Every structure is written in C-alpha cells, then in structure tokens.
Amino acid sequence: MTSKETFTHYQPQGNSDPAHTATAPGGLSAKAPAMTPLMLDTSSRKLVAWDGTTDGAAVGILAVAADQTSTTLTFYKSGTFRYEDVLWPEAASDETKKRTAFAGTAISIV
C-alpha cells in the first residue's frame, strides 16, 4: 500500500523584507480568510475588514482565518506582499486604491 502526499507551497511575501505578526482585538462581522486587509474601527477600537474605500486606512493583513466570534486577530503588521495574493474587498475597485491602502504603514504591496 502506498500513500501519496501533495505539497502546495504558499509564500505570500513578495521579497525578503521581514514580515512580523501581532495580535489585536477583533471586530469582524463575518468570516474572513487569511490575507484579508484590516483597518481599525475607530468607534469600537477593534480591527475589522478594510472597507476598500478609505485610502491609507488599512493597517494590517489577516494572517490566520477568523470570523465574527474571534475576539483576537493575528495579523501581519509589516512585510511586502504580492498584489495578487491579498484578498481585496470588492469596493476597492482600482489598482491605485489597492496599492495605496497601506500608505504610512510598514506593509508594501508589489
């Protein structure tokens, strides 16, 4: 009897910049897969999925899938990520908006 394993390599980093993670209170309203951009909800002071409309409001990228029951989120607070690997919201309708989502943070999109 033989066993066949399949390995799929997944490396979302776009270059050799270090990627660091952190944790913060979560305020998600639905399931969110890893690589979802996050922003700070100023009224609840919790991380939520980026709305896709506010330039420079994204502060991190979700590192581990989470949902509305997740009280703490693990997210990338720095690093360089490939444009095509980030799970952009539908409201982020053009490339410029996506590339400037993290303006002023330690996250770069290539």
From Swiss-Prot:
Stretches for region Disordered: 1-28
Cellular component terms (Gene Ontology): host cell cytoplasm; viral capsid, decoration
GO biological process terms held by the UniProt record: viral DNA genome packaging
Alphabetized UniProt keyword annotations: Capsid decoration protein, Capsid protein, Host cytoplasm, Late protein, Viral capsid assembly, Viral release from host cell, Virion
This protein's record includes keyword Transferase: no
Alphabetized InterPro entries for the sequence: Head_decoration_D (IPR004195), Head_decoration_D_sf (IPR036630)
Extent of Polar residues compositional bias: 1-18
UniProt cross-references to SUPFAM superfamilies, sorted A to Z: Head decoration protein D (gpD, major capsid protein D)
UniProt cross-references to Gene3D superfamilies, sorted A to Z: Head decoration protein D
Intracellular or extracellular location(s): Virion; Host cytoplasm
Protein family: Belongs to the lambda phage gpD family.
Main function: Stabilizes the expansion of the capsid head shell after genome packaging. The packaging of viral genome in the procapsid triggers a dramatic reconfiguration of the capsid shell, expanding from roughly 50nm to 60nm while the capsid thickness decreases. 415 capsid decoration protein molecules cooperatively bind the expanded capsid, thereby stabilizing the mature capsid shell.
Assembly description: Homotrimer. Interacts with major capsid protein.
Name of the featured protein: Capsid decoration protein
Organism: Escherichia phage lambda (Bacteriophage lambda)
